[in-house]
Amino acid sequence: MNKQEWIDKCNHWKTKWPVMQKEYEADDSDTPLNLYAVLDAVNKYSGRDDIIMGDAGSISYAGPVALNRKYDQRFVFSPAQADMGWAVPASIGVALSSNDKNVIAITGDGSFMSNVQELSVIRHHCLNIKILILNNRGYLSIKNTQEKYFENRVYGTSDKTGLEFPVFSKLAESFSIPYYLIKNKGDYENGVFYGLDRLQHIFAIEGPVIVNCICLENQEILPSQALKNGKQAGLHDMAPFLSDEELQEEMVVTL
């Protein structure tokens, strides 16, 4: 297989198994936002030379596959260290050295709290940073680990198991940073629309903004490695699993 054949094969897989599925789209229900719908909106409304920062947790798994880097965009994250709270302080350095480009820092509610003091630096320098909080009301990655590998003994990962978060709107107000709440497609508050399409307006604002995206508490990160018949499957065979026939058909080498 030559280079072009490999590229064609990869594009075939991207078309056959798109990351963004129809059922992930926001709707008029009370269901929280799907993480992939939020990232799809970032793809749609981010600028051609925006710099996107990814924190640890859900965004570090979903971001590399769901974000479609375009034109001169950059996606910067720290997967090797996976340190919670990295995105906000890192975005400060990027903003100060990028000639006032728009910086989009995507973080979880747990990671955001790890370096919340950096908001004072962002406000003081009026940095052009948009902080998107993927608010799943806790430590989703830690909770998933506890459920999968510790027989569902979950502790310290949500308000139900000993973890509390502040009211983010009041936190933003205390730093004099504009705040937006995004719940679902049909959400209105005081006559103002707060759906994901609101990101088009938010990304055009000069200066810092905090955006609180209310997301699913039990978000599945797909595709992912999982136990298959009691054994860890390989990177070529990830959940949701294909049939043996389809897997063999799509492989470029013989199993």
Indicate where each model-derived feature is located.
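Terminal amphipathic helices with adjacent charged low-complexity linkers/tails
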Residues: 1-9
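Charged, low-complexity surface segments at secondary-structure and domain boundaries
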Residues: 1, 23-27, 176-178
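A general, composition-driven signal for non-globular sequence regions
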Residues: 8, 15, 19-22, 119, ...
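A diffuse structural propensity rather than consistent per-protein peaks
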Residues: 6, 31-34, 167, 184
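Thiamine diphosphate
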Residues: 51, 61-255
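Active-site diphosphate/adenylate-binding microenvironment
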Residues: 12-88, 94
